[in-house]
Amino acid sequence: MLFKKKKVLPEKLPQHIGIIMDGNGRWAKKRGLPRSAGHSAGAKTFQSIARYCNKIGIKYLTVYAFSTENWKRPKDEVDAIMKLLRDYLVDSVNFTDENIKVKFLGNLSMLTDELNRLIKKAEDDSKNATGLCLNIALNYGGRDEIVRSVQKMAENGVDLSKLTEQELSDHLYTAGIPDPDLIIRPSGEYRLSNFLIWQSAYAEYWFTDRLWPDFSEKDIDSAVNAFALRDRRYGGTK
């Protein structure tokens, strides 16, 4: 367990963790399996990690499930991902029973009516949960989020010449959610890939070569303990 092994004090825990769930395809390829098998394995890891973050006291977890750029992938792979999402929403673990609040971030208008109905139900069913706030970034892109937010403000008559950082933040998908303290990226890649690019201005980063389906509670422990040792100055000095 995290607290017994490393004795990370609750006040040293990151309040908000963001995870770029990467490496499903490579995991499957290494095993001679279709990419869909990697996504299925990654979905199980997602559920396990969400439960663990809730258990150790993380307040917010945002996972990058499907980007605006992922539509460029082969249709059969996209269809497999959407089926996994549907199966998760209909048949899989009910996070509401574990006091986890579920919220979806992204341009959901491009999804099917059925998926949107299931997403709304998942959000409504968990809205009173007081444990982990689990944000699932779906058809999400950081640049797209900013553009849509500015467009929405312009449509609502906001004087953009007087726009402040706080006003923009208040119109993002993440409005009301604190900025991430820690961004985790598995799979050996060292980039943000358009994930929470506005919100992560002062986030700490933690990278690992481990592919997402192999990611475990021990990796969360390692990331959280590394975070606890860092000196966050937010551009100032101490």
Predicted regions and their residues:
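Flexible, compositionally biased loop and terminal segments
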Residues: 1-238
